[in-house]
Amino acid sequence: MLVNTKAKVGVFSIALGAYLPQFPSLVPEFEAQYDAFKKTIPDTVEIVDGGMVTTKEQAMLAGDKFRAADVDLVFLQMLTYATSYNMLPAIRDLDVPVVLVNVQKIKALDYEHTDIASWLGEGYACGAVGEAVADLERAGKRHAVITGVVEGGDPAVQAEIEDWCKAAQVRRRFRETNIAQIGRPYPGMMDLYIDETNLYNRMFLYTKQFDWEKMWAIADDITDEEAIRAKAQDILDTFDIEGGGTIEKVWDMAKYVVAFEKWVKDEHLGMIASHYDGFAQGKAGVLDSMLIPAFSMLIKQGTACAVEGDMKVAMAMSILKTISGTGQLSEMYSIDFNDDICIIGHSGSGDADISDKKPTMKIVKVFHGKTGGGYLTQFYPYTGPVTYLAITQDKDGNFKFVVAEGVNEEGPILSFGDTNMRTRFTCGAREFVNRWSEAGPTHHMAAATGRHIDTILKVAKIFNVPVDIVTR
């Protein structure tokens, strides 16, 4: 990614302190279990280690570490029974979910030969899970539980841990990067309009405003011909250009991409929403004509770029790109009633990582509904499972996620330069459109290859945002 971020995950374990002097063998046992648990957390995140906690004072010290690090999530390993006083001081001042990891060491106790120490150390992780959740509820804290076993490996547990870490990456990305708005939203698309202060307060995301006048001049100081040539080749490697492409043909575009990449890094941008509604002449016309493929090159590198000034779908694209590796702007395009299929797509910049074959670039005289004309890019999303995410708001400004899973199928698509795909939903096209529309999304959505609702639900819990699941 052009701007890298790394989630910070708080980790600690708890056990009842009264057990340890009674059964000294539990100390090395629990230390070994805690060390083994930390190794299951992927190195894509930074661990903030709160240690093994058996007293209130140790819990308070763990909490100090978590607060100082501004953790995005907390994993709590339940080693054996422990009172909730071992837990609450560590998370009392945090506003992130606490994931209780109830992972038993062995699959089953030897009922005939197990003594008390062995039971406490190897088979009693479940002892305090309900108590912990009860007190997290009373404290107003968000929570989740993962239950499983160490012996023999447990892929379900590992998948849940990795999923939560992906979700935590979204929070960190929103906190550490900014969203750029160039120009303003498309006039009259009131579903896209947003209160930037509310956005920052609720989603941690800060907006940086930019005028098009600055963008037109952004490439004026780019003189590194080697960098421009390399980027031109990157563009040719990414797209099949109608009528053939040469480095000379995409030179100006490459120069703008190099400039945009520097701008993204300098301004620490994770997302961009843009719309131009002026006279597409001179420098303005040059940039306007090539902005779609230029921004596609940024999307390829992890910076979500949304047309029509839609900051909400830029956020949705960034979420999906972060958790799945793909994030394509889309909207309801048409319905094929003969095949009971929804045609979903959009004109504008796209994500090369979602494309099953080399995307195409072609010139059109007019950008329909917009100023000017120039290059369109068409991507060809993979067949198979697909996830859609829209971000919307209620009358009080609260955000909401609207999600659905479907299956992209082979078949005829439109070929005038816009990305579009044929998606089948289990509820049928007619019912899907009814349900999706009734959920009140913006008219844009983001698409990602694969099934990701379970991860999106974790992202929503981290942000404390409700989710409407339309179909899966």
Regions found by a protein language model. Give the residues of each.
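Long, internal scaffold/assembly segments composed of regular secondary structure
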Residues: 231-323
